[in-house]
Amino acid sequence: MEIVSGASGWIEVICGGMYSGKSEELIRRVRRAQIAKQKVQVFKHSLDIRYDKDYVASHTGLKIEAIPVSSSADIERLVKDDTQVVAIEEGQFFDMGLVKVCQRLADRGKRVIVAGLDQDFRGEPFGPMPYLMAVAEYVDKLHAICMKCGNVASRTQRIIDGKPAYYDDPIILVGAFETYEARCRHCHVVLRREEDEK
């Protein structure tokens, strides 16, 4: 990623499945900005309470302080005029207004970094993330390792009571290792109730 100093704002998206390193990459970019003495604000969706409600935390234990919010409007309202970098964790949990909020912040000259799942457990586009990917200047899609076969994993497998989840299960279910596995396209399974009834 080649960034021109003094340029207007822009949007960066860090996406991929669970365990692909999205939070670690967001934390890395935030820390680099802080080392450069840039004013940074970090936000995360209030639904994400897996590790700590007031921190963005990676599965590996890295963490950085964040402001928990429940809507994209909260982010726009709380961003200070002198903030140079706005980082947003768990972008997929936000309402569709996040796309416009990020665009307005970038138009105001801010560097906006959004990390989140690009696909839900079904393997379908998740919330505002695909729209953010379309309007972002920079998109990095990270991959994990399939927990079944060891191939490159781009999907998130939801596991309920040791079995793959059903297609019509609720889209949002906050969890970590006990609920989700990284999977490749071949090993990713989504059950359909009509198949079980045959």
Swiss-Prot record:
A Pfam family: TK
Example GO molecular function: ATP binding
Metal-binding as UniProt keyword: yes
The keyword Heme belongs to this UniProt entry's keyword annotation: no
Catalyzed reactions per annotation: thymidine + ATP = dTMP + ADP + H(+)
UniProt: Zn(2+) binding residues: 146, 149, 184, 187
Annotated residues for binding of ATP: 16-23, 89-92
Top-level taxon in the UniProt lineage: Bacteria
EC number(s) recorded for this UniProt protein: 2.7.1.21
GO biological process entries: DNA biosynthetic process; thymidine metabolic process
UniProt-listed Gene3D superfamilies: 3.30.60.20, P-loop containing nucleotide triphosphate hydrolases
Active site, UniProt feature: 90 (proton acceptor)
Record GO cellular component, one term: cytosol
UniProt subcellular location: Cytoplasm
Annotated keywords: ATP-binding, Cytoplasm, DNA synthesis, Kinase, Metal-binding, Nucleotide-binding, Transferase, Zinc
Subunit structure, interactors included: Homotetramer.
Stated family: Belongs to the thymidine kinase family.
Alphabetical list of NCBIfam families matching this protein: PRK04296.1-1
Name this protein carries in UniProt: Thymidine kinase
Species of the source: Dictyoglomus turgidum (strain DSM 6724 / Z-1310)
Gene: tdk
